[in-house]
Amino acid sequence: MKNFDKFSTNEEFSSVYKVGKKWHCEGVIIFYLNSYEKKIAVVASKKVGKAVVRNRSKRILRALFAKFERYLQDGKYIFIAKNEITELSFSRLEKNLKWGLKKLECFK
């Protein structure tokens, strides 16, 4: 995630939620808004679990994003962890995330 910045305001989240594309995958929901900026946010609500579980889920999603980062178009990305993320293996999550990003046409 060297090239991507974090979201800084609620307005950025709102704009991506309202205008951006959305795709549900197993374990994660992906929001994407094509933009000249490169920004990312990883979210895990309390439905996912306690703090340790939420933080682990976010770390996993950031690691997967770092794997695909160089192949992705510029834009704003939001990854929302679902509660079933804890039951999936890393390789299964990687496959699901790659499939979802392809469906949103995020790859260069």
Swiss-Prot record:
Keyword Hydrolase: yes
GO CC term, one of those recorded: ribonuclease P complex
One MF term in the entry's GO annotations: ribonuclease P activity
InterPro entries: Ribosomal_Su5_D2-typ_SF (IPR020568), Ribsml_uS5_D2-typ_fold_subgr (IPR014721), RNase_P (IPR000100), RNase_P_CS (IPR020539)
PROSITE patterns, per database record: RIBONUCLEASE_P
Enzyme class at the top of the EC tree: hydrolase
One BP annotation, GO: tRNA 5'-leader removal
Keywords: Endonuclease, Hydrolase, Nuclease, RNA-binding, tRNA processing
Gene3D superfamilies: 3.30.230.10
Reaction(s) catalysed (UniProt annotation): Endonucleolytic cleavage of RNA, removing 5'-extranucleotides from tRNA precursor
EC numbers, comma separated: 3.1.26.5
Residue intervals passing through the bilayer: none
Subunit structure, as described in the record: Consists of a catalytic RNA component (M1 or rnpB) and a protein subunit.
Family, as annotated: Belongs to the RnpA family.
Free-text function comment from the UniProt entry: RNaseP catalyzes the removal of the 5'-leader sequence from pre-tRNA to produce the mature 5'-terminus. It can also cleave other RNA substrates such as 4.5S RNA. The protein component plays an auxiliary but essential role in vivo by binding to the 5'-leader sequence and broadening the substrate specificity of the ribozyme.
HAMAP family xrefs: RNase_P
Protein name: Ribonuclease P protein component
Species per Swiss-Prot/TrEMBL record: Campylobacter jejuni subsp. jejuni serotype O:23/36 (strain 81-176)
Organism lineage string: Bacteria, Pseudomonadati, Campylobacterota, Epsilonproteobacteria, Campylobacterales
Encoding gene, per UniProt annotation: rnpA
